[in-house]
């Protein structure tokens, strides 16, 4: 028979003992603040403490003291309370620090909870942004209707001039008279008798999209404004020659300058600025960094979470970005650095010499040459010159770097117990060809 309350009761008793410093045999010093705890509890809850206490398992009679500088006392308080109570107090301000400390202490459960907390915070922020964008779209549409009705009152006076020759029933917008008949902006007597055209309703969404694009580009709006004014003064008699689509677009382009022409207050004028339109931006919930794509936000969050998903296949070092891994592999593992065959130290043309034994050629540093004896080993000066700077006649030799800049390959030459790795890297035209790296396995 299992009693479910026994585990929680046991944790409560251990936590009470910790608070009263009863049977505490371990002291943790974090930036000058001392925390009392029990070694068996720390051993069971943290992989780092398990490794640390296993080394001192023979000295159980002496109290253990551990010192940490990787995190703050407040962060360790949250983790220690979780160990003794099972409750993790996470906030938007401490989740990154707690996750970093849990990663240091090798507490996988805490790391998983922190990742879930961060993901839920991002989901909430995304929902809030979607709600803001939907409200902004509604406000933009309502503002557009108000502007259109306001502008129609101003254009009615101008459309009453003798220049408007077409009747509203024809459904064709006039450039000079600025007739708004195709938008159904008519007086009350005409609205009851005139029916909207199907083609105009179909193009309503496309006109709104063009209007939003125009508002996001003020320079193009100014260009259309000046061009329309010139067309209005130079060609006042070209009415019926314009097509219906051109008249509709031109009427929309003229709607924004009206707010400046009539000057009916800052409310109407301010609504025409592109700042009121929604913009797709992703803001980091832990700093002020703002990006345009969600993928960039995920990559930025790695600097807060400490996640490094890209390991180096050669040395095991992990990186947070793929380009950093590529740069590391090129500069560290693919660099043609000359090493001594005996001591494996880096040598240059001054600190080492090329030695030839039969058909094998390798490089030794001056110290190793002194230990082995320079007289007992033949020094191949010609081979050293070829290794340092290959000449034109040695292009077919396997001891120099190829000049094909479009390829990168590794040629392995097996000779006895030594392997010579000849590697080509992409160099600029101004750089000299690098020396060969003998890699002794």
Swiss-Prot record:
It is found in: Nucleus. There is a cross-link at residues 178, 182, 199, 437 (Glycyl lysine isopeptide (Lys-Gly) (interchain with G-Cter in SUMO2)). Residues 234-248 have a biased composition (Low complexity). Disulfide bonds: none annotated. Residues 146-170, 178-197 have a biased composition (Polar residues). Residues 24-92 form the BTB domain. This is Zinc finger and BTB domain-containing protein 8A. Signal peptide: none annotated. May be involved in transcriptional regulation. Residues 146-252 are annotated as: Disordered. Gene3D superfamilies: Classic Zinc Finger, Potassium Channel Kv1.1, Chain A. The keyword Ubl conjugation applies. GO terms for biological process: regulation of transcription by RNA polymerase II. It comes from Bos taurus.
